[in-house]
């Protein structure tokens, strides 16, 4: 395995000693003898030992040298050496002898596993031992947590619980000294400046709060806030019932010559009813809850002095209002919670008594967390500049809803959600439907909203419009004041990388701190990965942003961290992603090949069709993996004859002589004609070459092994591992375009049958290492069974190859 720690800070020895005292590894002074000091550290960390005999038994299970136990070592006159300490460290960190390290040569494992190096050669004093112990406590175990967190799970900080009144920090990070079993759980109803259900009253929004017991006695906690429309339940069958049929034909669109101003959303306005009249003040909530739908990263911080708030927003169970995916109202309902937490909005104990309750326990510093829709709402909130929001950690977040459900003038579904759209998602998260009595009063109005969304989303055209512009958070990035950490999968075909790519470019020059972490996963969380200290980094960051701990987090954490797609457990740092100084490589299409654009080319043409026999159309529709295999397979050996052989064109470079680090947005330009007055093209950039690649999904290494607190909620330890079998290809990026949207996503151009047009588009941004000896391929086709509508029409496409090109950028 490889250890990658970015959230670990280096401190001077004086500070290390003070911090060791703060967490009770040292009482007043160090012991005189280095060996005695090490034994004392071990005894304090042996949490299962209640007697000297038990402790000696544990020491007998540890080796000091290849032929001596730690118990025997402490009885001997042998001095403590670096080799002895490192061998002990490797055992305490759960590494396995003969697998991860050699007992005879423990020092070589430090560089092999990428553990922090210890700047000692000899242990001359107990201060040297303390320095080494501090180093050990802040080093990751084999199982995805620093050693101090491992001790924490075993109960190290339980004795701190009765006397804890404020956070405790070690190595710049908050520690688990708050008893998570004594959390205060309460519900409040925040009055939002909205009336989306038009009942003549401002919408009340349910918020579920978990906060340390100490907040009842004057301690003020920072808040991790997760806005999750799924939090109060979903209507899966309802959404499935109104999912759109995608087996429909592509049609000709009326020519439309308009400007950007014609598709710019009108400023939001509304008429609001008056605020509720306050009938009195309350200091305690009148409602509680048993168990929320948690995010495991939030769970980790509940024992570290943070409060956590979950709110589902308008139209969800126990809240007022109605859902409208991506709307301004949805953003306002998100920021209303922040405003209450920051002391700038009212909330009530319930929906009838009008008893106001304040967040007196909050320190008015809020961070937002969450993935997908949750991270999307964090992004939306940040673009308002709302007071109190200090930072967001947005994972797999949408930055423009058009880029989620559309691409290049086409309906383009998120991965595995063919037929979903803005209306379907709104229906799925209208959890007020779960309460029949509540739903009775809003059903008719919500039906009207769904009809309006269906009309405005305009699946018939796929064009960008005022509707989509009102759901484009990129329009408001200038308002962002909160610092941002973005996390996204380079293989996320649900919320595609364009969303984070555009946001990263948009905030690059803003006067805020911004970081980005790109992993090789799909639509996933990465906080429980073994090879990267994501949770530690977020602890360092949140301690800095919400507790104002001067730990240098902004300088310590790299601006760009990207997981390698070739070597497992490898994460590299960069100054930028989609960097301006990347090297440009351009290729021209020739018969089945991609050649350097500067080389001499021939006037060649190639064509492909888009129709399939009904039998094979149904086969591919019901077996997308089979379709994708046949699309990329040039051997024509999948289940006999490859039915896609005439439905796509594949162009490959020569085998590369060196590794290429493809960075940013590949660009394709083709000279194309079609036999109808309409058409579409799809493209995939592909790595062709035999290799054992990373599995698409992370493997569970140890189930329920991580919690970060004693006797607390657990998470599975995960990691990307190599596939057992060699595979011949890997898709790097993809893109789609309607031939009538050659100018942009909102202008509609004429397409005359059999007339050639220049069509340009950008594929999804990426960061990909193409190994030496592999070939870079461009696959051109029309219907994408995973993404586009599937009309199975008699369309024939022709390309002028020497007028068609691919441009990529290579990182230095």
Swiss-Prot record:
Major location category of this protein: cytoplasm
SUPFAM superfamilies: alpha/beta-Hydrolases, Galactose-binding domain-like, X-Prolyl dipeptidyl aminopeptidase PepX, N-terminal domain
GO molecular function, one term: aminopeptidase activity
Active-site residues per Swiss-Prot or TrEMBL entry: 372, 492, 523
EC number(s) from the headed UniProt entry: 3.4.14.11
GO cellular component: cytoplasm
Compartment(s): Cytoplasm
SMART domains in UniProt: PepX_C (SM00939), PepX_N (SM00940)
Annotated catalysed reactions: Hydrolyzes Xaa-Pro-|- bonds to release unblocked, N-terminal dipeptides from substrates including Ala-Pro-|-p-nitroanilide and (sequentially) Tyr-Pro-|-Phe-Pro-|-Gly-Pro-|-Ile
Superkingdom: Bacteria
Keywords: Aminopeptidase, Cytoplasm, Hydrolase, Protease, Serine protease
HAMAP family to which the protein is assigned, alphabetical: Aminopeptidase_S15
Function: Removes N-terminal dipeptides sequentially from polypeptides having unsubstituted N-termini provided that the penultimate residue is proline.
Record protein name field: Xaa-Pro dipeptidyl-peptidase
Species: Pediococcus pentosaceus (strain ATCC 25745 / CCUG 21536 / LMG 10740 / 183-1w)
Lineage of origin: Bacteria, Bacillati, Bacillota, Bacilli, Lactobacillales
Gene: pepX
């Amino acid at each position: 395995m490889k250890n990658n720690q970015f959230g670990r800070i280096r401190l001077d020895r004086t500070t290390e000693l003070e911090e060791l005292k703060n967490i009770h590894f040292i009482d007043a002074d160090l012991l005189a003898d280095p060996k005695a000091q090490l034994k004392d550290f071990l005894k304090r960390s042996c949490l299962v030992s209640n007697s000297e005999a038990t402790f000696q038994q544990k020491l007998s299970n540890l080796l000091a040298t290849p032929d001596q136990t730690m118990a025997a070592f402490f009885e001997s006159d042998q001095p403590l050496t670096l080799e002895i300490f490192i061998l002990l460290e490797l055992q305490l960190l759960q590494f396995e002898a003969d697998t991860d390290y050699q007992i005879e040569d423990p020092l070589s494992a430090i560089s092999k596993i990428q553990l922090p190096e210890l700047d000692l050669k000899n242990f001359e004093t107990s201060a040297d031992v303390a320095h080494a112990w501090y180093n050990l406590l802040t080093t990751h175990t084999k199982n995805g947590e620093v050693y101090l967190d491992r001790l924490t799970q075993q109960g190290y900080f339980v004795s701190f619980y009765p006397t804890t009144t404020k956070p405790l920090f070690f190595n710049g990070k908050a520690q688990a000294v708050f008893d998570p079993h004594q959390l205060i759980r309460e519900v409040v109803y925040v009055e939002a400046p909205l009336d989306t259900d038009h009942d003549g009253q401002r919408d009340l929004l349910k918020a579920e709060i978990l906060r340390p017991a100490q907040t009842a006695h004057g301690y003020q906690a920072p808040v991790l806030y997760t806005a999750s429309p799924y939090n109060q339940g979903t209507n899966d069958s309802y959404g499935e019932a109104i999912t759109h049929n995608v087996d429909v034909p592509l049609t000709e669109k009326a020519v439309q010559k308009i400007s950007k101003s014609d598709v710019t959303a009108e400023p939001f306005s509304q008429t609001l009813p008056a605020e509720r009249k306050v009938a009195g003040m309350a200091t305690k909530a009148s409602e509680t809850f048993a168990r929320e739908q948690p995010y495991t990263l939030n769970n980790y911080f509940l024992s570290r002095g943070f409060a956590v708030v979950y709110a589902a927003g308008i139209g969800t169970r126990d809240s007022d209002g109605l859902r409208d995916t991506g709307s301004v109202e949805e953003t306002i309902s998100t920021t209303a919670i922040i405003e209450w937490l920051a002391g700038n909005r009212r909330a009530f104990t319930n929906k009838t008594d009008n008893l106001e309750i304040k967040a007196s326990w909050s320190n008015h510093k809020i961070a937002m967390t969450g993935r997908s829709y949750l991270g999307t709402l964090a992004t939306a909130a940040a673009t308002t500049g709302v007071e109190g929001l200090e930072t967001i950690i947005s994972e797999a977040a949408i930055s423009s809803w058009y880029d989620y459900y559309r691409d290049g003038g086409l309906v383009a579904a998120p991965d595995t959600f063919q037929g979903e759209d803005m209306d379907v998602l709104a229906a799925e998260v209208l959890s007020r439907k779960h309460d029949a009595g509540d739903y009775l009063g809003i059903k008719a109005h919500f039906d009207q909203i769904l009809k309006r969304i269906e009309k405005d989303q305009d699946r018939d055209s796929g064009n960008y419009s005022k509707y989509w512009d009102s759901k484009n958070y990129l329009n408001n990035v200038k308002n962002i004041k909160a610092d941002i950490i973005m996390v996204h999968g380079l293989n996320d075909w649900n919320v595609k990388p364009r969303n984070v790519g555009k946001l990263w470019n948009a905030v690059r020059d803003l006067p805020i701190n911004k970081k980005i972490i790109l992993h090789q996963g799909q639509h996933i969380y990465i906080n429980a990965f073994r090879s990267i200290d994501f949770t530690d980094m977020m602890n360092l960051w949140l301690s800095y942003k919400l507790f104002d701990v001067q730990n240098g987090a902004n300088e310590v954490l790299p601006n760009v961290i990207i997981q390698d797609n070739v070597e497992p457990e490898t994460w590299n740092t960069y100054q930028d992603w989609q960097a301006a100084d990347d090297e440009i490589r351009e290729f021209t299409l020739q018969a089945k090949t991609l050649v350097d654009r500067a080389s001499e080319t021939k006037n060649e043409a190639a064509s492909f069709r888009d129709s399939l026999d009904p039998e094979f159309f149904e086969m591919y529709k019901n077996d997308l993996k089979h379709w994708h295999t046949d699309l990329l397979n040039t051997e024509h050996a999948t289940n006999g004859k490859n039915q896609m052989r005439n439905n796509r064109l594949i162009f490959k470079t020569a085998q590369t002589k060196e590794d290429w680090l493809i960075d940013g947005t590949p660009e394709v330009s083709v000279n194309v004609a079609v036999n109808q007055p309409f058409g579409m093209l799809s493209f995939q950039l592909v790595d062709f070459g035999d290799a054992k690649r990373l599995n698409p999904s992370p493997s569970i290494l140890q189930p329920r092994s991580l919690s970060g607190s004693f006797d607390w909620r657990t998470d599975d330890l995960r990691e990307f591992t190599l596939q057992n079998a060699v595979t011949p290809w890997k898709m790097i990026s993809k893109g789609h375009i309607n031939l009538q949207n050659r100018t942009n996503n909102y202008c509609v151009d004429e397409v005359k049958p059999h007339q050639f047009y220049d069509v340009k588009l950008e594929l999804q941004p990426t960061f990909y290492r193409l190994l030496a000896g592999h070939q870079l391929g461009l696959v051109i086709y029309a219907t994408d069974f995973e993404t586009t509508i599937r009309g199975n029409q008699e369309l024939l496409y022709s390309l002028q190859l020497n007028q068609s090109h691919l441009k990529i950028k290579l990182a230095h």
